C-alpha cells in the first residue's frame, strides 16, 4: 500500500450507527464557529505571552508593558481583543488598571496547551 493511502480506509463500509450517534450529539455550527474564534486568540505570540503573565497574577497595564517590552498602546490593543473574547477582565483602581484572567477555565485551557506541547 502506498504511503499516501496508509492513513485512509481501504473500503467503503459506513458505520451508520456511529455516524448517527455522533451526528445527534454534535453541537450546532455556531458553537464550532465560536470555539474557532476563541482559539484564534491563542494563535498570537503576544497574546499568549500576556495570558501567561496573567495566569501568574493580576497585573497593571504599565507592568505588563515593561514585562513584555511593548508600548502601552500596542498592549492595550491586544488586551482589548482578549477582553472582547472574554479571556481577560479588568479592574480600575484610580488611575491604575489591573488585568486578570476572566476565570479558571481560561487558565485551564492555557495550562493544558502547555502540557500538550511538553509531551
What are these regions (language model features)?
Residues 27-73, 97-104:
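N-terminal helix-turn-helix DNA-binding core of bacterial DNA-binding proteins
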Residues 28, 87, 119:
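Hydrophobic patch in the ABC ATPase nucleotide-binding domain
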Residues 66, 77, 83-84:
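Alpha-helical residues within the helix-turn-helix
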Residues 83-93, 100:
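Beta-hairpin "wing" of winged helix-turn-helix
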Residues 1-42:
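N-terminal leader segment of winged-helix/HTH proteins
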Residues 100-119:
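Conserved segment of winged-helix/HTH DNA-binding domains
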